[in-house]
């Protein structure tokens, strides 16, 4: 059997095995304090060299985008008004190959978008490359101890200490990773594959940093729930209304004013830019924390019924600012891809808002009308709650009132979060 045939056979076996597995990405933070000054500089130089190689290829894609490009030991880049030669010393061969493959994938995506009738441009130069693919475990990277607290990267002499390796279960198969640079530090995003039959078990029986099993306390609600999405939150069929708003912080606005006054290219501007990136990352983390808590609440139900709303269109309407800061689309995506709760998707053209949940009368309702008033039976209730009742009726279920255990669990999950408003609607 030739090498090409062995690769083809292995790829077929892997694809067959992946059908029974689910990918999970674990985020590990690199402990920069454990590195020497020299090793820290080499780690950050990986991202600089990745940028140089990327821009070198993009400058002349027709002649430079080829297989042998990853073998280059130096590239020519434009620095100001002149060209300079920069060495590629720290990037390993597989890291360079992954960067070349990333450019090919970007070109393919542009080609597909053009075939769909969209207007496309061309690949542009990058000021920063903040992620480096590590495409093969045991070659590009590997954990050097059983606790998964040390990682050896191809091209670097010493192992790097990482925090959070205890999250990765022993039953999983580590496939690939990405080295990601953020304002708060450098992270390793490890992609692991877990058998679908073991996914819930490994999630419930997590281990702490001392490798001690700590089962999760997981209260479940043995009933179905319907959810209606809003630009600023969600409404559940049990009457719970959860709203949140993540706006620009005063510190962010102040930093934006400060950086506009700094001279371009100066060190002071660079310092403010780092602070600005950290503030943006903080806002993103706050938003993601709320999405995680909403998902945690919904996963406790047996079934979640929701309508296939075209949230992409909401970005173009009068609620565009609200929908961009609420991350409602992320909640919908998690429900669609989740294995921890069964979901029922209702067609987006079902008139759930226009229909009375009491008598079935269908009538027009303005967007400004927050209360549904039926002209036939006189039913008056919140328009979003009325929509959730109709979602339940479409799958043959009755509505349910909020129970004390649901209310207590919701309050416990969100805590005293000043950015989240929890209320009951009728």
What are these regions (language model features)?
Residues 1-98:
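Gly/serine-rich nucleotide phosphate-binding loop at the start of the catalytic core
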Residues 31-40, 83, 115-116, 144-148, ...:
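Intrinsically disordered, low-complexity coil segments
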Residues 47-50, 99-107, 275-283:
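Short amphipathic alpha-helical coiled-coil/interface segments
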Residues 57, 95-111, 385-398:
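Stable alpha-helical structural segments in soluble proteins, enriched in small hydrophobic residues
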Residues 58-65, 107-118, 194:
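Long, hydrophobic, amphipathic alpha-helical segments used as structural scaffolds
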Residues 62-63, 72-73, 114-126, 267-274, ...:
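Short coil/turn segments at secondary-structure boundaries
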Residues 74-185, 246:
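Acidic carboxylate diad motif detector
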Residues 187-426:
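Positively charged, helix-rich recognition surfaces that bind polyanionic ligands
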């Amino acid at each position: 059997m030739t090498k090409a045939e062995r690769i083809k056979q292995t790829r077929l076996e892997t694809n067959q095995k992946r059908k029974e597995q689910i990918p999970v990405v674990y985020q590990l933070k690199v402990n920069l304090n454990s590195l020497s000054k020299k090793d820290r500089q080499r780690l950050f130089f990986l991202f600089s060299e990745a940028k140089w190689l990327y821009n070198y290829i993009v400058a002349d894609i027709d002649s430079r985008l080829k297989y042998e490009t990853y073998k280059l030991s130096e590239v020519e880049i434009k620095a100001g008004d002149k060209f300079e030669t920069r060495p590629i010393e720290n990037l390993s061969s597989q890291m360079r190959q992954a960067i070349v493959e990333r450019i090919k994938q970007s070109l393919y995506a542009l080609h597909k978008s053009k075939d769909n009738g969209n207007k496309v441009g061309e690949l542009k130069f990058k000021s920063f490359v903040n992620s480096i693919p590590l495409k093969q475990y045991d070659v590009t990277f590997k954990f050097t101890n059983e606790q998964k607290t040390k990682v050896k990267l191809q091209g670097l002499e010493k192992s790097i200490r990482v925090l959070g390796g205890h999250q990765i279960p022993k039953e999983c198969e580590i496939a690939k990773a990405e080295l990601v640079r953020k304002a708060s530090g450098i992270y390793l995003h490890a992609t692991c594959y877990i058998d679908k039959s073991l996914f819930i078990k490994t999630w419930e029986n997590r281990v702490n940093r001392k490798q001690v099993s700590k089962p999760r306390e997981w209260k479940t609600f043995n009933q179905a729930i319907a959810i209606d999405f809003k630009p600023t939150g969600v409404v559940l069929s049990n009457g719970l209304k959860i709203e949140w708003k993540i706006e620009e912080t005063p510190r962010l606005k102040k930093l934006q004013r400060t950086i506009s006054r700094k001279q371009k290219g100066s060190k002071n501007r660079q310092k403010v830019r780092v602070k600005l990136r950290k503030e943006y990352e903080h806002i993103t983390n706050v938003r993601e924390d709320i999405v995680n808590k909403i998902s945690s609440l919904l996963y406790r139900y047996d079934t979640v019924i929701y309508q296939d709303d075209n949230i992409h269109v909401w970005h173009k309407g009068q609620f565009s600012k609200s929908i961009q800061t609420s991350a409602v689309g992320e909640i919908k995506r998690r429900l669609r891809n989740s294995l921890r709760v069964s979901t029922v998707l209702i067609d987006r053209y079902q008139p759930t808002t226009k229909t009375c949940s009491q008598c079935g009368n269908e009538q027009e309702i303005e967007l400004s009308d927050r209360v549904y008033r039926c002209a036939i039976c006189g039913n008056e209730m919140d328009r979003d709650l009325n929509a959730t009742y109709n979602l339940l009726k479409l799958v043959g279920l009755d509505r349910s009132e909020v129970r004390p255990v649901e209310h207590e669990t919701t309050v416990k999950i969100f805590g005293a979060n000043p950015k989240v408003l929890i209320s009951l609607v009728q």
